[in-house]
Amino acid sequence: MRKILITGVNGLIGSAIAELLLSKNEVIGTSIEKNNQTGLDFQYIQSNITDNKTLQNLPKPIDIIVHCAAIITGDDFSNALINTNCIGIQNTASYAINANCKNLIFLSSLPIIGKPSIVPITETHPINPPTIYHITKYFGELALQNLLGKDRVIVFRIPSPIGRKTAPNKIVPVFVKNAIENIDFNILGQGKRIQNYIDVRDIARAVECAIEQESSGIFNIASEHSYSNKELAELCINLFNSSSKINYAGEDKEEDFQWIVSTDKAKRELGFTAKYSIEETLMDISKNFKK
């Protein structure tokens, strides 16, 4: 039985990973919050990855670290962003060395590439981070590979993770809620922006595959199909038998962005293919809005 530490375990992705891995592994979860908020039964330790002394006191040895902890913000001048996503990465790498960790799985962000210029998007797509947040995620990739060695690090570049715990102000829960309540959709531009959504349960499955294969390297972890905003709205309307209408207004500065993602490398080296359809995920999210 492997001993696996998950940072940011209370988050959207971290909690899904813990839920899947619990049955076959000893899971230790850590997050900044005082209490375990996942509803799952595992050893939970409150810890802040920016505090190296506290981090070094976590259990040792550890077989695998799944690093989910991160600050997500559009504030390019946020000190917390740098402290968590950069200094926190260095501290986590130091702990990994001291804990004799065999492999570290880092959840990165596919949008570090900036505007997609080559589709489908592969792992060799040029990198052009559009914000400081995305710069910190790319820093995380490079720093971990440098500090631990490329053969010990698995990087997952993820597009748009979704699940039942997705924040209610995000586009997918908003669309689902609108459809259920027969509220009209207001979409910027012509709704042509194409996005890739992946269920957090599939991300957890990808983590499990990487652990089993004892892999290393950079992998796009995405679903098989991408959808425009217009297609997503139409899908919600049809799925929930809604009378909602679609209205178009304003400008979408990313109207021509196409997040069409190649997962060939993950299929070939990890044996991973996304299982959950967008319809299944939308139905799962809808449970938040149905009495």
Regions found by a protein language model. Name each.
Residues 4-23:
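N-terminal Rossmann NAD(P)H-binding glycine-rich loop of SDR-like oxidoreductase domains
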Residues 49-84:
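NAD(P)H-binding glycine-rich loop region in Rossmannoid oxidoreductase-like domains
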Residues 50, 80-91, 127, 131, ...:
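Glycine-rich NAD(P)-binding loop of the Rossmann-fold in SDR/ketoreductase-type enzymes
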Residues 91-132:
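Conserved Rossmann-fold NAD(P)-dependent oxidoreductase catalytic core, especially the SDR/UDP-sugar
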Residues 179, 183-291:
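C-terminal substrate-binding subdomain of Rossmann-fold SDR/epimerase-dehydratase oxidoreductases
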